[in-house]
Swiss-Prot record:
Name of the featured protein: Hemin import ATP-binding protein HmuV
EC numbers: 7.6.2.-
Taxonomic path: Bacteria, Pseudomonadati, Pseudomonadota, Alphaproteobacteria, Hyphomicrobiales
PANTHER family: HEMIN IMPORT ATP-BINDING PROTEIN HMUV
Keyword presence, Membrane: yes
Gene Ontology molecular function: ATP binding; ATP hydrolysis activity
Function: Part of the ABC transporter complex HmuTUV involved in hemin import. Responsible for energy coupling to the transport system.
Gene Ontology annotations for the cellular component aspect, listed alphabetically: plasma membrane
Family label: Belongs to the ABC transporter superfamily. Heme (hemin) importer (TC 3.A.1.14.5) family.
EC category name: translocase
Subcellular location per the Swiss-Prot or TrEMBL entry: Cell inner membrane
Species this protein is from: Bradyrhizobium diazoefficiens (strain JCM 10833 / BCRC 13528 / IAM 13628 / NBRC 14792 / USDA 110)
Length: 268
């Protein structure tokens, strides 16, 4: 599959601080990549650079074989959609109005169809007339995810496989809706979208991503299939915890030693 997004030697400084240092990354159409790493590793900085919202101090980003800086805001919105970690919820729009913002200049009929489908997918169809600030944090997150799905669908209808960026999309969600959201992202990868998600739940990242990209101290520490990246040594070196890596149906999962000891004690 052809590359949808390619980052070359990306570095970003803020004053004297180096937030990102020489990171390279390529993600193909139909591939889902999870970015993992400790707090302050540069994950959100990398995602903002890949989105075009932030310009690198060094290096370049190519989106669909074109320098991302050469796109107009309208052109960029048609080729990549991003769910940010921090979302302004003070504006008094309804859920339906928020999701409709992703449809751009689509006809009322087409926009309505896309909005209905997205609200059904995130489980908010019954809240469509509710004011966004009256919802819980998790419900607001799902409403904005529905908007992003509509934006992505509109762009891909015109320009082919696009880029879906998710910055800690599950941070406000309960376990069920965490899984629902990541499964929805996984479905988009199945239809050709390139998906890049920052996920703090390591086992969720392992379960759904094709590749894991590990950042540490602003540098690329590892990039590869989950079976190669998820080792006891990597977990210890990057996250500074002692953990055991198990396998279930060929998929690794991580259990910190403290949890393992607690589980063993509970069985005694």
């Amino acid at each position: 599959m052809s590359a949808v997004i390619e980052a070359r030697h990306l570095s970003k400084r803020a004053g004297r601080a180096k937030l990102l240092d020489g990171v390279g990354l390529t993600v193909a159409a139909g591939e889902m990549v999870a970015i993992i790493g400790p707090n302050g590793a540069g994950k959100s900085t990398l995602l903002r650079l890949l989105s075009g919202d932030l310009r690198p101090s060094q290096g370049e980003v190519w989106l669909k074989q074109r320098d991302i800086g050469s796109y107009t805001p309208r052109e960029l919105a048609a080729r990549r959609a991003m769910l940010s970690q921090h979302i302004n919820v003070t504006f008094p729009f309804t859920v339906e109005e928020i999701v409709l913002m992703g449809a751009g200049d689509r006809s009322a009929r087409e926009a309505g169809r896309l909005v209905d489908a997205a609200l059904d997918e995130v489980g908010l169809a019954h809240f469509r007339e509710r004011q966004l600030p009256t919802l819980s944090g998790g419900e607001q997150q799902r409403a904005h995810f529905a908007r992003v799905l509509v934006q992505l669908a509109c762009g891909e209808a015109e320009h082919g496989p696009g880029l879906l960026l998710l910055d800690e999309p599950t941070s406000s969600l309960d376990l069920r809706h965490q899984i629902d959201l990541v499964e929805a992202a996984r479905r988009r990868a199945g239809t050709g979208t390139a998906v890049i998600a920052i996920l703090h739940d390591l086992n969720l990242a392992i379960r759904f991503a094709d590749r894991l990209v590990v950042l540490s101290g602003g540098k690329l520490a590892a990039d590869g299939p989950r079976t190669e990246v998820v080792t006891r040594e990597t977990i210890r070196d990057i996250f500074e915890i002692d953990a055991v890596v198990h396998q279930a149906d060929g998929v690794p999962y991580v259990l910190p030693q403290s949890m393992r000891a607690a589980a063993s004690a509970a069985r005694i």
